[in-house]
């Protein structure tokens, strides 16, 4: 155990001395010259500005993942309409949804009908008692 502690102390002391030797070569006026505008221009070359613009740009729409999962970048509305026409015939397709009295959201299944929701809440309360 004492050998491990001695090795750890030796390692820490040697890294501290090595870091001091490297730090001695630095310019002491580095921080005092920081506000010089010419040096700032040298520090921020064109590729760095280009990198910042690339980071700040908005991602493409196909890169977003919504709650329903990844969108297929190759699919388009025309392809989906053609598929629906093939499945349901060439008649007019109704785009209305069939609404029910409940929906499933992030918080679980919820009732749209307030009476049904209150009834289910009371049933859950009675079961817990």
From Swiss-Prot:
Q: What residues make up the propeptide removed on maturation?
A: 20-56
* TM regions (residue ranges): none
* Similarity remark: Belongs to the tachykinin family.
The organism is: Homo sapiens (Human)
Return one GO MF term.
substance P receptor binding
Q: Where in the cell is it found?
A: Secreted
Signal peptide span = 1-19
Please name one Pfam family that this protein belongs to: Tachykinin
Instruction: Return the protein name.
Output: Protachykinin-1
Organism placement in taxonomy: Eukaryota, Metazoa, Chordata, Craniata, Vertebrata
> Which residues are recorded as modified (Methionine amide)?
68, 107
Q: Main role?
A: Tachykinins are active peptides which excite neurons, evoke behavioral responses, are potent vasodilators and secretagogues, and contract (directly or indirectly) many smooth muscles.
What GO terms describe the biological role, i.e. biological process, of this protein? associative learning; cell-cell signaling; cellular response to nerve growth factor stimulus; chemical synaptic transmission; detection of abiotic stimulus; inflammatory response; insemination; long-term memory
Q: Where is this site: Cleavage?
A: 59-60, 63-67
GO cellular component annotations of the record? axon; extracellular region; extracellular space; neuronal cell body; neuronal dense core vesicle; synapse
Alphabetized, the UniProt keywords read: Amidation, Cleavage on pair of basic residues, Neuropeptide, Neurotransmitter, Secreted, Signal
PANTHER family, per database record: PROTACHYKININ-1, TACHYKININ
């Amino acid at each position: 155990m004492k050998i491990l502690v001695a090795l750890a102390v030796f390692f820490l002391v040697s890294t501290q001395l090595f870091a001091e030797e490297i730090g001695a070569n630095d310019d002491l006026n580095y921080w005092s010259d920081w506000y010089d505008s010419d040096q700032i221009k040298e520090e921020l070359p064109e590729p760095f500005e280009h990198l910042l613009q690339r980071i700040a740009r908005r991602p493409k729409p196909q890169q977003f993942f919504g709650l329903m999962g990844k969108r297929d970048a190759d699919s388009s509305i025309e392809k989906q309409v053609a598929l629906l026409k093939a499945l349901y015939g060439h008649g007019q397709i109704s785009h209305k949804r069939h609404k029910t009295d409940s929906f499933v959201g992030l918080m679980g299944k919820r009732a749209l009908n307030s009476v049904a929701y209150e009834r289910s809440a009371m049933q859950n309360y009675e079961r817990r008692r």
